Amino acid sequence: MSQIKFLFVMDAEVGAPLENGEGIIVLDHEGAHYVVDALISNELYRSHVFAPEINWYLKQTQAEHNEKNEILKKLYEMRFIRYNYAPKKTHAVTVDRTVLMIGESEEALALVESAKRYFDVTHVLPQELLSIEGKFGSFTAHFNQKSEEEGEMKEQESEVCCSQLVVCDQLSELSKHRGVECVMDYSDTDALLKRIRNRIGHYEYKKTITYDATHCMYHHHEKTACSLCTDICPTFGLVSDETRKELIFSALDCIACGKCVSVCPTGAIDFAPFPQKAFLEVADFCQGKKILLIAEAYLKTLEGCELPSGYIPYVIETDPFLSLLHLKALFEKSTHTVLFYAPHIGEATHEALKTLNEESLRTCHQKAIELVQSKEAFEAYMTLTCKNDAVCKKEIENRQRIQHG
């Protein structure tokens, strides 16, 4: 059987606004069980890409049948564009059970003993450590090891190779590497051990950032003030070589937060899972619609909230990558105020919102983006919007009635 491009699995809760023959294969759960290969689906039945926004939209929307049908098709196409542009190549590192633990407190010693149940542990005191090099899966630590020879304590330099590291007693810059954890970042040591355990084996990752040096204000510029991306990066996924004036990217250490994308003033850095070109193509499907901009992780938070007719969810992987360009594009496509649900936003996104709203209020006499940061705020905004729409509709009807005498 050839691959099914779009699969919709219906159940009693979401129904089936579509019928077969409209570009989407519609099956019940029993039928979907026999599907060999589907590219995009509203369920996890043997699909390459799961689109949770589809079921979410059908459960929350107040739209009539025809509008549901229209939006549903758009959601599949929007996901397809994201899939087409996203990186396909997978990289991998082998992670064995070797762990280096650095610490000297009683808590550190207790953690070392606990970790020995699961890992091949080497314990080093902070004052013994000389240097650490390498990367996740293949770190090498150099340290002084004391030993007694002929009644005298002597030090000799030793080294140990390990896949992961744990810093027990203090916060450390080392934790910017993937595979290095600080105990102080965890309230529960069991959670820490579980995280380390889950990485053992074949660890896969993909490229998360793309870069065009020709547009970079740092690359080979002797006199440059731009260091926005390296300043905001929370890991060693992006660092600068001050001697060569070049940026160095590590897909292995990158956590795909997208913060570097949001602050880049020239667009030299782009978010590989959802690049600007794809973002703009997806925005075309929102022409004239009211947009709910929301990260995929927050869909569950808004379950049970009504989504009025006319709204289309614009779902993104994460929101810190959003820049002024992204937000402005959505507003221009929609022409309505874009509703942006995000419990937390970074400083760069906040500044982009402020700049865009000031401009739109000055030129269009309306806000471009309305930020809501809680479920209660979302519901309050929707209630107010629906009331205002009803008032406007009534005023228009009254004017038409007067005009036609």
Give the predicted meaning of each segment.
Residues 230, 237-238, 242, 308, ...:
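Long hydrophobic segments that form regular secondary structure
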Residues 346-375:
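Short acidic, glycine/proline-enriched helix-loop-strand junctions
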Residues 224-248, 259-276:
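Iron-sulfur cluster-binding cysteine motifs and their immediate structural context
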Residues 1-232, 236, 288-305, 365-405:
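Ferredoxin-type iron-sulfur electron-transfer modules and their immediate structural context
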Residues 271, 275-287:
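A contiguous, basic/glycine-rich beta-loop/short-helix subdomain that forms a polymer-engagement track
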Residues 309-322, 333-344, 348-350:
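Long, compositionally biased charged/polar accessory segments in the mid-to-C-terminal portions
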